[in-house]
């Protein structure tokens, strides 16, 4: 499947003006009497949007006097299996973060299939979504997820650190390796890598796969679905080799497996590295750690032809309503607020993303100029896992990448294991 309808959306969004996943802790609005049922004005919420959900909750409470939101924030690797367990046991909150498509344990297809999510097809914003985004909210023809932001993955550079090092962002694969060598020689590694959090392991690989795999074969996913291609006998092998070449060249700080996502943010924000390969959502978190810093997302090159470079870009995680929500009316009110101009703009401003709807009036963030350009010129591919048949493929990839970095596995073994999980189907 090719992302060939996104440019229309971005052109509209910018005329009036892209696995996500963040690490966090727990926070809560003050409770009100009465628990979550009946006439209660308390909404329960589980989120993975560290650094942005806080402002959205405040805005929602302000717009709805008397309403209080009790919410928790946690990282994707902890959140995804946890929310599935809570839904199965009947202890899940009213509203929760849910990912598009079918690629992880908290993805729309995975949670809607057993009946855990409320059908949102009748909500006013659903038919305003572009087809490429709307399809990822659906299971069996019904929409279940409020997707508010478009995100991209690439190299996010600390501009001040670059200037101090006297370096500029690379446009080709050869330049990238030279950039890493020069940065290492100056004592400031090119990129922070927080592979202690397993979801982070995929981001460099996805950035390389976008160009290496889809540049010459935009229909690779269709071939996989038809049984005509495999991970192990495709340019995925090249992309994975390039990932490890970056590691051997010194593109990352020492001990990525011992570095958390939170710690990697600090390295990039404070100039201990020149940047970080992440989604655009990290920009807001870097600015929190360094308010005076300037951070810019650029494509990560994988070949020596800049014209062939592609960026992974797609709708990020959104919000869904528990089919057994204790306060269903308030839950619907919240997801509709998320999809309103106020709610959507609050989210995308904090996350440094782009709105999924074109009528919010939001001006594009300058830090996303290259992402906006790539989407507008049809140079993007979906996040790879969103089109995989089950969450096991991604889970195998994430654990396997950690094992490769620890010397316990090999690229060939990992890709064979991913193929086996892919072929196992839904």
Regions found by a protein language model. Name each.
Residues 73-82, 173-178, 255-269:
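Short helix-initiation/N-cap motifs at beta->coil->alpha
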Residues 62, 89, 249, 287-350:
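Extracytoplasmic/periplasmic substrate-recognition and gating elements
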Residues 102-153, 296:
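Hinge/lid segment of periplasmic solute-binding proteins
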Residues 80-92, 110, 161-162, 181-185, ...:
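Short helices/loops that flank or line small-molecule/ion binding pockets
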Residues 225-256:
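Glycine-centered hinge/linker elements that transmit conformational signals in sensory
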């Amino acid at each position: 499947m090719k992302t060939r309808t996104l440019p229309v959306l971005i052109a509209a969004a910018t005329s009036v003006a892209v696995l996500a996943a963040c690490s966090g802790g727990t926070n809560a609005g003050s409770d009100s009497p009465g628990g979550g049922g009946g006439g209660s004005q308390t909404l329960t919420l589980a989120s993975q949007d560290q650094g942005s959900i806080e402002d959205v909750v405040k805005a929602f409470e302000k717009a709805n006097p008397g309403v209080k939101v009790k919410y928790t924030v946690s990282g994707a690797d902890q959140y995804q299996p946890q929310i599935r367990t809570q839904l199965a046991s009947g202890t899940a909150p009213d509203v929760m973060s849910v990912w598009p498509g079918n690629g992880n344990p908290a993805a729309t297809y995975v949670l809607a299939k057993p009946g855990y999510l409320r059908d949102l097809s009748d909500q006013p914003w659903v038919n305003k979504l572009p087809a490429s985004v709307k399809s990822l909210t659906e299971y069996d023809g019904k929409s279940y997820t409020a997707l508010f932001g478009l995100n991209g993955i690439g190299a996010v550079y600390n501009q001040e650190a670059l200037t101090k090092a006297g370096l500029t962002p690379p446009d080709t694969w050869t330049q990238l390796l030279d950039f890493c060598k020069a940065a290492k020689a100056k004592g400031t590694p090119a990129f922070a890598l927080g592979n202690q959090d397993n979801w982070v392991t995929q981001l460099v690989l996805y950035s390389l796969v976008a160009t290496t795999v889809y540049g010459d074969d935009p229909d690779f996913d269709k071939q996989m679905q038809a049984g005509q291609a495999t991970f192990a006998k495709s340019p995925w092998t090249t992309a994975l080799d390039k990932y490890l070449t970056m590691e051997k060249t010194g593109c990352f700080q020492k001990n990525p497996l011992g570095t958390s996502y939170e710690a990697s943010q600090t390295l990039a924000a404070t100039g201990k590295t020149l940047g970080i390969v992440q989604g655009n959502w990290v920009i807001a978190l870097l600015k929190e750690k360094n308010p005076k810093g300037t951070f810019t997302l650029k494509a990560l090159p994988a070949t020596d032809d800049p014209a062939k470079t592609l960026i992974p870009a797609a709708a990020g995680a959104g919000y869904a309503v528990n089919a057994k929500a204790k306060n269903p009316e308030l839950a619907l009110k919240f997801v509709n607020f998320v999809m309103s101009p106020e709610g959507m703009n609050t989210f995308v401003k904090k996350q440094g993303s782009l709105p999924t709807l074109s009528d919010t009036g939001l001006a594009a963030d300058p830090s996303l100029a290259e992402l906006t350009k790539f989407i507008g010129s049809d140079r993007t591919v979906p996040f790879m896992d969103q089109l995989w048949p089950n969450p096991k493929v991604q889970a195998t990839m994430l654990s396997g990448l950690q094992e490769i970095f620890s010397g316990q596995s090999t690229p060939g073994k990992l890709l064979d294991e991913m193929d086996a999980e892919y072929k196992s189907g839904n």
